[in-house]
Amino acid sequence: MRVDLFDFDLPDERIALRPAEPRDSARLLVVNPHAESGPHAESVPHAESALSDHHVYDLPSFLRAGDALVFNDTKVIPAQLEGIRHRDGAGGQQVSATLHMRIGPSRWKAFAKPGKRIKEGDRIAFGHSGESCFLGALDATVEEKGEAGEVTLAFDLTGPALDEAIAAVGHIPLPPYIAAKRPEDERDRADYQTIYAREEGAVAAPTAGLHFTPDLFAALDKAGIERHFVTLHVGAGTFLPVKADDTDDHKMHLESGYVSAEIAARLNAVKARGGRIVCVGTTSLRLIESAAGEDGKIKPWAGATGIFITPGYRFKAVDMLMTNFHLPRSTLFMLVSAFSGFETMRAAYEHAISTGYRFYSYGDASLLFRKDK
């Protein structure tokens, strides 16, 4: 499918630089492809058309007792590193690296800038600027150089010692569309983290989850909505542009995830008794769809997934999706177009832009019903 079909114009002022306060006061666009045609309209109590405007705190009224929300409990780490590259004893040059996937106790895949300056065998001293050392030695060797600035870094430290050094030296890797407008600050350490984050390893937040508050959790509990947690460590590749002209030619980035046997069994039980699987965020959806068999049964999962969902994909397990508003030409806009329908999502985004919804990581949310349900 042509990538330019997923393009659209977004005014700069629609990009959110800070989250709504409180978190669940963000707007919620409910997108129900079936509402106008009638047969499924009763499943959306307040929606008289395919698109209806609400707030995140209204979420319980769109769900039924016995439905299950699936959250990604990954925790963002300060994965943005600044350092000095050394080669053959010569003077150093400043470089930056964004860690995006751990591949061993001391090894990480990272995106380095400027990538052209880096070669295999280079040494990088992170936490240093010129001759000054800020926070101890976090040194690495460039073990391998790939495409698009990707490198494999072998750190001198390992295990918990490496984690502590990264936490001391690193910065929260704000998405490029925010970082281009303002620097990271102390507020982002809290704002760019879900309230239920517990499994360290992400370099980008599962942003749909940023809208949840203790009060919203209490309302969902009262409504009989189940909560289940899976883990997908979101990588920096989520921000990579699609450079191919056709979706068939795009190579999807890998992200590592985990679905326990217990959670798989609980979600299958929800489906068996007629409940719906409602994924909070595209990351939990991609993980659940990776773990699901052709029969729709969810299996335990541990490993990397590079699932790339575009229109024509047949969803196996997920019934509804809550997600933020995504970038033009992005793999995530392709995913939501597959989920609720290409024309439906183009109309939804046109409506969101014209009525002042806030886009991207700190922006508003949408609740999507699956087009083939």
From Swiss-Prot:
Compartments, as annotated in UniProt: Cytoplasm
Segments forming a coiled coil: none
NCBIfam families tied to this protein: PRK00147.1, queA
Family under the similarity heading: Belongs to the QueA family.
Any one GO cellular component localisation term in the record: cytoplasm
Predominant location category: cytoplasm
BP GO annotations: queuosine biosynthetic process; tRNA wobble guanine modification
Enzyme class per UniProt: transferase
E.C. number: 2.4.99.17
Summary of the function given for this chain in its UniProt record: Transfers and isomerizes the ribose moiety from AdoMet to the 7-aminomethyl group of 7-deazaguanine (preQ1-tRNA) to give epoxyqueuosine (oQ-tRNA).
Subunit structure and binding partners: Monomer.
PANTHER family in UniProt: S-ADENOSYLMETHIONINE:TRNA RIBOSYLTRANSFERASE-ISOMERASE (PTHR30307:SF0)
Gene that this sequence comes from: queA
Organism: Rhizobium etli (strain CIAT 652)
Pathway the protein contributes to: tRNA modification; tRNA-queuosine biosynthesis
Keyword Metal-binding part of the UniProt annotation: no
Catalytic activity from the UniProt record: 7-aminomethyl-7-carbaguanosine(34) in tRNA + S-adenosyl-L-methionine = epoxyqueuosine(34) in tRNA + adenine + L-methionine + 2 H(+)
GO MF annotation list: S-adenosylmethionine:tRNA ribosyltransferase-isomerase activity
Protein name: S-adenosylmethionine:tRNA ribosyltransferase-isomerase
Keywords, ordered alphabetically: Cytoplasm, Queuosine biosynthesis, S-adenosyl-L-methionine, Transferase
HAMAP family: QueA (MF_00113)
